Amino acid sequence: MKIVKILVKVLMVLAVTTSVSHSQIYFEDNFDNPKESEKKWHALYGDWQFKNKEYHQLMLEPNCMSVVSDEYWDEKWDNYTYEVKGNAIKGAEGFLIMFRCRGLMQARGKALKKPPARMNNQKSSLEYWWNLGGWGNTRSKVESWGGIGGADSGDTIKYGDPYDIKIVNTPKSYTVILNDKEVASVEDTSQDGVGRVGLATWSTAAKYDEVIVYGPDGPKLVSSREKVSTTWADIKSKLEQ
């Protein structure tokens, strides 16, 4: 009877591991290759530079923005997690992490460069950003033009410290996470979760790194070979008992 149970388990393992789980990375940039990074980003305003394997924005003026280029974004993506590391260098505030961006971005008194072609042709504008350390670095909040803002918190940003920033975007909601701690989750079905991501600053110099956007299946490739070897070791141990 024991042998029969083990054989059944072997068959189940083989059935499960015939399907390989793939990673679902939509976009990523670690800025190791400036020439490649130049293709991935479209700066709208500010002094954006690829240096020291990071993406720097060095102008101390409001509304400095850069979005992912057309070639690296699929407008159908409406369910994604966006992660980035941020480090504020100097200035008045912290970070502006853009998501759900479509159409023309708010100029806010600045002469923005022409946006990516697809964004330029999108009739209805939509813009979200997680304002971290905003209002003179006194608080944080998701602001939205065309959708629903929220996620108010007392989070401020310390210059020179690295921050792990994550936004989980779905067609019905978005959740913002700072240094692995969930800050807030906001229900928002107004725009179905569509729109690309970007980076921005407000009267602040900052640098960004390790940008990744991935789908619901996650960013890591699950190795079926590792699963088989681990499970077989367990089965072998039982056979020897």
Which residues make up each language-model segment?
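Extracellular glycan-recognition surfaces and repeat-rich motifs
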Residues: P34-S66
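Secretory/extracellular carbohydrate-interaction modules
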Residues: E61-G146
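Short, solvent-exposed beta-strand-to-loop segments that form ligand-recognition rims
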Residues: I177-A200
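Extracellular beta-strand elements of beta-rich domains used
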Residues: F31, D209-V213
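Bacterial N-terminal signal peptides
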Residues: K9-S19
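Beta-strand-rich interaction surfaces with strong enrichment in secreted/lumenal proteins
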Residues: V67-D74, A151-I157, G198
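Localized edge beta-strand/strand-to-loop motifs within extracellular or lumenal beta-rich domains
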Residues: D161-T175
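Extracellular carbohydrate-recognition regions
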Residues: H22-A43, S223-K236
